[in-house]
């Protein structure tokens, strides 16, 4: 009996430690296909390695929020960190600037990563 209580206690302590860990999100912004001005494409913002799972993601065009973006299901990795993909259709031009803005408890202010069409 004492052994099973000890095991349960250790499991609960381990779970509490996992839940207390905070990890800052890694952000990657890229297009599905090589960009061509005037040709429809998809803009992706892949956010990974974050914990806890509460997060806000916005895609931006020239600093303004793009409405009605799509989001994948929130998933987790082997290390219990989370990842998610935000994406939308877009048509790149020479002058438009696209970015992804992420708000998370580990960030003092929202982090914005600009799409680099040459990457």
Curated annotation (Swiss-Prot):
GO molecular function, one term: structural molecule activity
One GO CC term, this protein: lysosomal membrane
Disulphide bond pairs: 45-100
Alphabetized InterPro entries for the sequence: B2Microglobulin, Ig-like_dom, Ig-like_dom_sf, Ig-like_fold, Ig/MHC_CS, Ig_C1-set, MHC/Immunoglobulin
Signal peptide range: 1-20
Claim: Signal is one of the keywords in the record: yes
The entry's keywords: Disulfide bond, Immunity, Immunoglobulin domain, MHC I, Secreted, Signal
One GO-annotated biological process of the protein: positive regulation of T cell activation
Pfam families: C1-set
Ig-like C1-type domain span: 25-114
This protein's record includes keyword Ubl conjugation: no
PROSITE patterns cross-referenced by the UniProt entry: IG_LIKE (PS50835), IG_MHC (PS00290)
Subcellular location: Secreted
Family: Belongs to the beta-2-microglobulin family.
Function of the molecule: Component of the class I major histocompatibility complex (MHC). Involved in the presentation of peptide antigens to the immune system.
Quaternary structure, from the entry: Heterodimer of an alpha chain and a beta chain. Beta-2-microglobulin is the beta-chain of major histocompatibility complex class I molecules. Forms a heterotrimer with MR1 and a metabolite antigen.
Protein name: Beta-2-microglobulin
